[in-house]
Amino acid sequence: MAAPTAAALSTLSTASVTSGKRFITSSFSLSFSSRPLATGVRAAGARAARRSAASASTVVATIAVGDKLPDATLSYFDPADGELKTVTVAELTAGRKAVLFAVPGAFTPTCSQKHLPGFIEKAGELHAKGVDAIACVSVNDAFVMRAWKESLGLGDADVLLLSDGNLELTRALGVEMDLSDKPMGLGVRSRRYALLADDGVVKVLNLEEGGAFTTSSAEEMLKAL
């Protein structure tokens, strides 16, 4: 099947990407694991260790070049109809080259002034080098992401702004960082990164340390292509 156009990708309205699934409010049921208690304790210990590592200065991630991206559900407001919808990582990356970059937070200075604008500016060059989809991911909720997009006057910019509000993708990649000790009230966020996936397999991974912005720019991604 032919790769969708950049314009189609920007609204996720192509045949290869599910036309969008509206959020449906429903009750949830509790489920209980049958794993032995010791296994659960070990898992909890591992999670605690990873959280501790994530708050340290050294970058620790469970994703690496050559790995298949974990699937996760992200949300966004479809500019075509204004509806709140979801898309999975698999839908974004299957059978195409996709650039995903993450910012610690919408409306924060570096993210608003450099990181996101850089990818918007270089979107055409990235597409010319074979990139089919470009998406910005943040742990902010979809309402904040929409407001951020509107505040920057992005309109139909060829970069998707996706919410990972439950940190599903962020934690699956092992790139969460705990900023609870900072005065800004940011809590747990995603490290700044940019990756290129080809049919869901990571080919390039530029992961920053702390709040740095050195290797995850659009310019650095262009150099890697």
Curated annotation (Swiss-Prot):
Alphabetically list the UniProt keywords.
Antioxidant, Chloroplast, Oxidoreductase, Peroxidase, Plastid, Redox-active center, Transit peptide
Which residue intervals define the domain Thioredoxin in the entry? 63-225
EC number(s) on file: 1.11.1.25
Residues annotated as catalytic: C111 (cysteine sulfenic acid (-soh) intermediate)
In which compartments does the protein localize? Plastid, Chloroplast stroma
Q: Where is the transit peptide?
A: 1-42
Known InterPro entries for this protein?
PRX5-like, Redoxin, Thioredoxin-like_sf, Thioredoxin_domain
Q: Name one GO molecular function term.
A: thioredoxin peroxidase activity
Pfam families with a match to the protein in the record: Redoxin
The answer to whether keyword Ion transport applies is: no
Q: Which GO terms describe its cellular component?
A: chloroplast stroma; cytoplasm
Please list the reactions this protein catalyses.
[glutaredoxin]-dithiol + a hydroperoxide = [glutaredoxin]-disulfide + an alcohol + H2O
SUPFAM superfamilies the UniProt entry points to: Thioredoxin-like
Task: List the GO biological process terms.
Answer: cell redox homeostasis; cellular response to oxidative stress; hydrogen peroxide catabolic process
Q: What else is known?
A: The active site is a conserved redox-active cysteine residue, the peroxidatic cysteine (C(P)), which makes the nucleophilic attack on the peroxide substrate. The peroxide oxidizes the C(P)-SH to cysteine sulfenic acid (C(P)-SOH), which then reacts with another cysteine residue, the resolving cysteine (C(R)), to form a disulfide bridge. The disulfide is subsequently reduced by an appropriate electron donor to complete the catalytic cycle. In this 1-Cys peroxiredoxin, no C(R) is present and C(P) instead forms a disulfide with a cysteine from another protein or with a small thiol molecule.
Q: What exactly does this protein do?
A: Thiol-specific peroxidase that catalyzes the reduction of hydrogen peroxide and organic hydroperoxides to water and alcohols, respectively. Plays a role in cell protection against oxidative stress by detoxifying peroxides. May be involved in chloroplast redox homeostasis.
> Which PANTHER family does the record cross-reference, listed alphabetically?
PEROXIREDOXIN (PTHR10430), PEROXIREDOXIN-5, MITOCHONDRIAL (PTHR10430:SF16)
Q: How does it assemble?
A: Monomer.
Protein family (similarity comment) = Belongs to the peroxiredoxin family. Prx5 subfamily.
The identity of this protein, by name, is: Peroxiredoxin-2E-2, chloroplastic
Q: Which organism is it from?
A: Oryza sativa subsp. japonica
Q: Which gene encodes it?
A: PRXIIE-2
